[in-house]
Amino acid sequence: RRQRQMCIRDRNKPVYSFSDFKGQKIRTMENSYHLAFWKAIGANPTPMSFSEVYIGLQQHTIDAQENPYEVIVSNNLYEQQDYVVETNHLPHLISLIVNDDFFRDLPEDEQEIMTEAAKIATEYAREQSDARIVDKIAKIEESGTKILTLDDQTRADIREASQSVYESIKENIDPAIYNAYMNGIEN
């Protein structure tokens, strides 16, 4: 259970298959991995300041953008498109992070307390996030915007086409961090 991140469409062209991404102008952050991901699946990634996204959708400077439901609703982005396509290409992993030196310096009983408290807090945060997502989806659907879910084959095609991006990330960060992230996605 994680907050999903997806691609938003502003025109009457829904995404049902991998080939539907080809040539689409998708607003991304100015992040080399985001740009590489969208290029790998055939889209035309367009770095753009977030403050320009609403107008970019409105004026068709961009066809789509990637954001979680919270951002879509809080910025009224759903007003400028007919479809929300749940690509789930980026998870929003809710976790508690603590300085390793600080944690190791704690007595064992306090480490156990912190570990248990972190599990409880993380579960609560995920439940709250899930509830907010349900609320945001309802608001989007009430506006007339359709929410589409990609089929397993399209997800597999995306995964295969973007594998080189993940390999690049893996080469540039600590393997333990990469593996923890990927394990979080799987679980």
Which residues does each PLM region occupy?
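N-terminal secretory/targeting leader peptides
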Residues: 1-5, 9-187
